[in-house]
Amino acid sequence: MMNPVLWLQMTNMISYQGLVRTFLNKNDLKAFIAFPSSLYPDDPNWIPPLFIERNEHLSAKNPGTDHIIWQAWVAKKAGQIVGRITAQIDTLHRERYGKDTGHFGMIDAIDDPQVFAALFGAAEAWLKSQGASKISGPFSLNINQESGLLIEGFDTPPCAMMPHGKPWYAAHIEQLGYHKGIDLLAWWMQRTDLTFSPALKKLMDQVRKKVTIRCINRQRFAEEMQILREIFNSGWQHNWGFVPFTEHEFATMGDQLKYLVPDDMIYIAEIDSAPCAFIVGLPNINEAIADLNGSLFPFGWAKLLWRLKVSGVRTARVPLMGVRDEYQFSRIGPVIALLLIEALRDPFARRKIDALEMSWILETNTGMNNMLERIGAEPYKRYRLYEKQI
């Protein structure tokens, strides 16, 4: 397998209808990462990602690159970058679904159909050279990272590790022959609006007698993260586009969560001492970095640490949640999920976290979507995954 870093070192320029379409050069990486901010000067909901985090995400430090090879392009007009895109092959996806599918991601561009055509033309041509006959996305870089194109909910800022976008993206992508694969939903709830009906409370009290809900054990953090991985892979294995998390990916994620998430915001549910479900409540880092313009220097580090550890943030996101497969369609499976959500209420109150995003949830997951609606949440953002035969 070719090292992704080597792909970044390739350079080539192709003229396309007055544009210059360029393979991403290693020296262009900074401009590639910074480009989206040029599209949002008047958008109060745009939050520039931290450059250091995006740089690591697009490097061999991202454990996803153990099984992903990828290429990236920028489109230039009059010497200025006007768009960007990636294309990638995920070997774990191919092992599970066959070798005919590749993916695209990190699509951002000005409101110009020629720019979109140039970028997607480059991505599709490269994927064809890798044996793909089908393309889906956007993924940055796979389904376990940032996924989906924002199509509803432009009027609010994204939570941590969720994408933003421009309203014109969908129309230009669909004009190129892409069609809906599936939608992902983000649900929003105020902590004080979290309510359980008498019927739900009765069910929860019955199941509570059989289930132990505990905080993660920080003394065994690495081992606990692998328990979470096993539960996630078990519970999500039948979902659309599922690709399993690797041990390396979850270990790296654990190294990050260890410093960002308090112990009492990661819960594991057990039945007869056997872990069966979990939930992770992540303080909304985007709230803490909104005014840092993507930089932690010279004083960004101090501001970020103060906001996360001292003053706190007022919103959070549940980026990871899972119930083992054997409980998915049982009577107690959904109730275990409710008990885990309930467990976050008190630690949120102690930290003055007022609101929570649950994301993302497949639109076809009617059980979870109905449950969230019943406890006071509302769907406030919708993201689309597209597909196309190439």
From Swiss-Prot:
GO terms for biological process: single-species biofilm formation. Disruption phenotype: Reduced formation of biofilm. Induction: During biofilm formation. InterPro entries: Acyl_CoA_acyltransferase, BcerS-like. Gene3D superfamilies: 3.40.630.30. May be missing up to 10 N-terminal residues compared to orthologs. This is Protein YghO. It comes from Escherichia coli (strain K12). The lineage of its organism: Bacteria, Pseudomonadati, Pseudomonadota, Gammaproteobacteria, Enterobacterales.
